[in-house]
A protein has these predicted regions:
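Extreme N-terminal leader/targeting segments of oxidoreductases
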Residues: 1-31, 49
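Helical element adjacent to the flavin cofactor pocket in flavoenzyme catalytic cores
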Residues: 137-145, 149, 168-230
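Dinucleotide-binding Rossmann-like beta1-alpha1 core, especially the glycine-rich loop
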Residues: 77-158
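Glycine-rich FAD pyrophosphate-binding loop
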Residues: 49-69
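C-terminal catalytic lobe of FAD-dependent flavoproteins
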Residues: 307-423
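Active-site substrate-recognition segment that forms the wall
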Residues: 74, 106, 114-122, 208-210, ...
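Helix-loop-beta segment of a Rossmann-like dinucleotide-binding subdomain
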Residues: 20, 118-128, 160-194, 198, ...
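N-terminal Rossmann-like FAD-binding beta1-loop-alpha1 element of flavoenzymes
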Residues: 27-56
Length: 439
């Protein structure tokens, strides 16, 4: 434990980001964005490309929060299956949402190519290895639904999953060839560079302290300045604070932790995810894992409710790595870090319009690389005057999570319970608890 670096692997391996200064004085713009994560920078980039003068204010450095700390998995779609979405939202609205979110990786990799972003981008696909026969049956239904919609998705046998993952613990799985991986911080910094090259302005260390409507425009106050604009986009996701209490109460921030091994020797590395896919398994507290460009295994899962590394989180993640890949027991771990994931009640991201000229996008439920990039484009299109019917994504009312003040306690208890349920299943070989699988 003494040699464990309490820092993100991505902060060590990403190219430097742009140098930005705090906001000072009174500025004006045609659009202002709060938050320089994937959502905010995607929105700013699309606005700047449309010729709008845009200012982004960021509370910290670019990438210090979720967009620079995640696993870098570019996953198509949202968690509910396509048929479920069409049943809940209707065939038209649900169908358009399925199409919009399913194409998320297309947008990510198109932006990377168009702006020359160096971020170790690899589009080898995304795997869902099944941890039980029941989970495999659900994956089979998911495959059928996506195939009906023309997606490049296939069901895998036990031997095929073994070949693609190098792990013998799974009984089959799903391969979605639309997905891929990026170095998440490098991708974010590349988006920031693209915003600046396109004429946008980004101010770091400029937390939004106050947001108010004044003389026909929105005004954002920061410690050393202010910016006013007719349109403001709130893009703070799980880190939304008092700038919008009503938005903060629509989601529950849940910690996610990751560990990274030292570079794996070549003879071992060739047997682990040999084709370069990312994977997220089907445990209730799913484990997501991938290799980085340096040959390190990166694995993450839900953590305890603390943003500081906890011994039990470290031990849980070490055990998970060795359960999936027992051949790595001699490989040291070099990095450990965590961040917050915004979870919503319906497991869907939300596009909100709390007031005229005020927009927000949040709640990616662990699929933020692709979905937040898409949300940024949707918010930009709405800010540019697109009608809601043109977006291909519904605008949701702002509805708080019931008993939000207690949601952290409930989520903490749920995480501990699901760890217990998954542990029983691993010991007993089958899951008997009545808990719905929604990986």
């Amino acid at each position: 434990m003494s040699a464990l670096k309490l820092q993100s692997l991505w902060s060590v391996t990403a190219p430097p980001g742009p140098l930005c200064s705090p906001l000072t004085g009174a500025q004006r713009a045609q659009a202002a964005v709060i938050g320089a994560g994937y959502t905010g920078l995607s929105a700013a980039l699309h606005l700047a490309e449309a010729g709008r003068e845009v200012v982004v204010v960021e509370a910290a450095e670019i990438g210090e929060r979720a967009s620079g700390l995640n696993g870098g998995q570019v996953i198509p779609g949202v968690k509910p299956d396509p048929d479920t979405l069409e049943r809940l939202l209707g065939p038209y609205t649900g169908g358009r949402l399925v199409a919009t979110t399913g194409a998320g990786p297309d947008l990510v990799f198109e932006l990377i190519a168009r702006h020359g972003i160096e971020c170790e981008a690899k589009r080898a696909g995304w795997l869902q290895p099944a941890t039980s026969e029941a989970a495999l049956e659900q994956l089979a239904r998911r495959v059928v639904q996506w195939l009906r919609r023309g997606a490049a998705v296939s069901l895998l046998s036990r031997s095929e999953v073994l070949q693609l993952t190098g792990s013998a613990i799974y009984c089959g799985g799903l391969l979605d060839r639309r997905g891929g991986t990026v170095q998440p911080l490098a991708y974010l910094r590349g988006l920031a560079q693209a915003v600046l090259r396109t004429g946008g302005r980004i101010h770091t260390h400029s937390p939004a302290l106050r947001l108010a409507r004044r003389t026909g425009a929105w005004s954002i106050d920061t410690p050393q300045g202010s910016v006013s604009a007719p349109v403001v986009i709130i893009a703070t996701d799980a880190y939304t604070d008092s700038i919008s209490e009503e938005l903060r109460r629509t989601m529950v921030p849940v910690p996610s932790f990751q560990v990274a091994t030292a570079p794996i020797p070549a003879e071992l590395r060739s047997t682990i995810l040999p084709e370069g896919q990312a994977a997220s398994d089907t445990w209730h507290l799913l484990r997501y894992f991938r290799l980085d460009a340096g040959g390190r295994l990166v694995l993450g899962s839900r953590g305890t409710f603390s943003q500081s590394p906890q011994l039990r989180d470290v031990q849980y993640h070490y055990h998970a790595v060795h359960e999936i890949y027992p051949q790595l027991k001699g490989i040291p771990f070099e990095y450990h870090w965590g961040g917050l994931v915004a979870m919503t009640q319906d497991q869907l991201p939300h596009l909100h319009e709390p007031a005229p000229g005020l927009l927000a996008g949040l709640g990616y439920n662990g699929r933020g690389v692709a979905m937040a990039t898409v949300m940024g484009r949707l918010l930009a299109r709405r800010a540019l005057g697109a009608q809601v019917a043109e977006l291909g994504f519904p605008v949701s009312p702002v509805v708080p999570v019931p008993f939000h003040a207690l949601s952290g306690i409930g989520a903490r208890a749920t995480i501990q319970y699901l760890r217990f349920v998954d542990g029983l299943a691993r010991v007993g070989g089958r899951l008997r608890a009545h808990v719905p699988f929604r990986a």
